Amino acid sequence: MYRFLLSRQWVILTLIALLLIPTMIRLGIWQKHRYEMRTARNDLVSSALHAEPVPVERLASPGHAVTSTEKYRTVTATGTFDTAREEVVRRRTNSDDEVGFHVLTPFVLTDGKVVLVNRGWIPANGAQTTFPKIPAPPAGKVTIKGRLKADETTAASGIKEIKGLPDRQVMLINSEEQARRLGATVLGGYIEQTAPEAKGDSPEQISDPGSEDAPLNYAYMIQWWLFAAGVPVGWWVLVRRERRDREEAAAREQTEEAEPAPV
């Protein structure tokens, strides 16, 4: 009845089905892990953004690597901007995906330590080899607020470090490198400034990090597992159809043989 399953065509089809089922199950498990990872990241970012602001020195210190639970925490700092030694970070985009610079300004705290402040985005008006015109920050002693970020690395950001850049231009924000350049005690990580709010021609401040689309991974997980469940069902439907077609063909042959030959 089902001897046709031993034919070359059906053996190949069955082997393909047997390979597809575990592959699709594994893809579903991978999407499940992606969903859990993105959900955990979204929860971590949300709790950090909604936590009460704290002084930056409560979380950061010289040489300290900002942890995942500290990242995006709102911090405050009181001191003065050192615009004479500020730099720009190349190839950064704004909310409209326009390429420009981020303005990186050392902020000297009241105790003499320095924290790096990313004041926001400015357009790249002019040659990339020249230092752009940067709107000045508030003069004198000021209190700022922003999100604490970890030092940037090529591994984490995908941005390659480039040697021999024009003066006062960098590719990555790194507190250890800035400490050597400034000859100062620099806190680990940096601040993405959110207050005072940008006014007039001030740099465009960086918006809050968006949440990752975790539900999409959940939908893909369900989709792959439905595909995995559908493979044996589809295989069985094809088997039943093949059996029915063969039985109908055999019945027609018997009918033709039983009919009397014309006189």
Go through each PLM region and give its residues.
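Phosphate-centric recognition/catalysis
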Residues: 65
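Surface-exposed, charge/polar-rich loops and edge strands
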Residues: 1-60, 68, 73-115, 119-263
